[in-house]
A protein has these predicted regions:
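Hydrophobic transmembrane alpha-helical segments in integral membrane proteins
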Residues: 1-7
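General nucleic-acid-binding
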Residues: 189
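Juxtamembrane segments at transmembrane-helix boundaries
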Residues: 7-27, 37-180, 186, 196-197, ...
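Cytosolic signal-transmission helices at domain junctions
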Residues: 209-228
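Short alpha-helical H-box segment flanking the phosphoacceptor histidine in two-component systems
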Residues: 204, 228-229
Length: 230
């Protein structure tokens, strides 16, 4: 259901990319939203088809890597609001994605559910901290209620991730099947995904603000031109 909400948001903002619009959403955010929605769908289908919890299908490695990719793209979007992306950041981002894929694939064969979760939580938490640092820089230059909303959503998503981390680190027995996953871990995971969705909504609102301002300026200019010609 959350994936459906994200796909709906994606289809709702695509019209901002029309050529006649002077202000267009960042493609990094669009790609992040698309990748995240696709990944949630893949996870949902994968969970329904899973046969061996100890050795999940290869698609789970792809899905986990895409989750990190979506968080990375959102972090790059926040960075782009502050300054252009340097070549070193782009190269480091590509290296991170490759590293995550190799690590997740290795843990799929030789690791546990807890180890895979730990890797994901640490990577996404690090990217969220980066996002918050960039968002703080943006707020110094741009006054926007949606940016404040985005920061709150990011803080809450990070809090849910910390909850997941605490549960995984304090759990003594190894989880070997889906029914063994603690209900509290499921709660924190769902909470994180919900906050992530809210952050996408906040960014969508931010772009809607920018488009509205640009349209208002254009309308004012058109009126001034007409008054000069009349």
């Amino acid at each position: 259901m959350i994936a459906a909400i994200q796909f709906g948001l994606l289809f709702g903002v695509i019209h901002y990319l029309r050529p006649q619009n002077k202000v267009k959403p960042s493609l990094y955010w669009i790609y992040s939203l698309a990748v995240n929605a696709l990944t949630l769908t893949m996870f949902g289908v994968g969970v329904l088809r899973i046969d061996n919890f100890a050795l999940p299908e290869f698609s789970f490695s792809i899905s986990n890597t895409l989750f990190i990719t979506a968080a990375l793209l959102q972090a790059l979007f926040c960075r782009l609001l502050v300054k252009p992306l340097s070549r070193s950041i782009k190269v480091a981002s590509a290296i991170l994605v490759v590293f995550v894929f190799i690590s997740i694939e290795y843990l799929r064969h030789h690791g546990t559910f807890e180890q895979r979760t730990l890797l994901m939580v640490v990577c996404i938490s690090s990217l969220l901290v980066w996002q918050l640092l960039e968002q703080a820089q943006v707020r110094k230059r741009i006054e926007s209620p949606q940016l404040i909303f985005l920061m709150y959503a990011t803080y809450l998503e990070l809090a849910f991730l910390c909850g997941r981390l605490a549960i995984v680190l304090t759990k003594t027995n190894v989880i070997r099947d889906i029914p063994e996953i603690p209900a509290l871990l499921v709660f924190f995971t769902v909470g994180q995904i919900v906050m992530n969705t809210i952050s996408y909504i906040a960014i969508g609102g931010f772009w809607a603000e920018k488009v509205a301002v640009a349209n208002a300026i254009t309308s004012k200019e058109n009126i001034e031109i007409k008054s000069l010609l009349s």
